[in-house]
Amino acid sequence: MAGQKIRIRLKAYDHEAIDASAKKIVETVTRTGARVVGPVPLPTEKNVYCVIRSPHKYKDSREHFEMRTHKRLIDILDPTPKTVDALMRIDLPASVDVNIQ
């Protein structure tokens, strides 16, 4: 698989979980002999929801909630079959969304 590249995108609401997962992936890949670029922090997506506190009136009294989606990008250069096998076996938390290209 010389000259190829695997791109892994991680998404999570918890920044500690995504950093721990990225560290685990980088350690696994470097142990198998492939080169790693990253983890590269991508812009955090912030969704803000505005909710009226009262069910009927008092429209001026509102509450804001926000959800932050943290993202990381990891590139694996020149992966070996051993690297791909190790990535398939790695155990990551359910709160981290992994997209492999």
From Swiss-Prot:
Gene Ontology biological-process annotations: translation
Alphabetical list of PROSITE patterns matching this protein: RIBOSOMAL_S10 (PS00361)
Name of the protein described by the UniProt record: Small ribosomal subunit protein uS10
Highest taxon in the source lineage: Bacteria
PANTHER family: 30S RIBOSOMAL PROTEIN S10 FAMILY MEMBER
Family, similarity comment: Belongs to the universal ribosomal protein uS10 family.
Gene Ontology MF annotations: structural constituent of ribosome; tRNA binding
InterPro entries: Ribosomal_uS10 (IPR001848), Ribosomal_uS10_CS (IPR018268), Ribosomal_uS10_dom (IPR027486), Ribosomal_uS10_dom_sf (IPR036838)
GO CC entries: ribonucleoprotein complex; ribosome
NCBIfam families hit by this protein: PRK00596.1, rpsJ_bact
Gene it is expressed from: rpsJ
Subunit structure: Part of the 30S ribosomal subunit.
Pfam families: Ribosomal_S10 (PF00338)
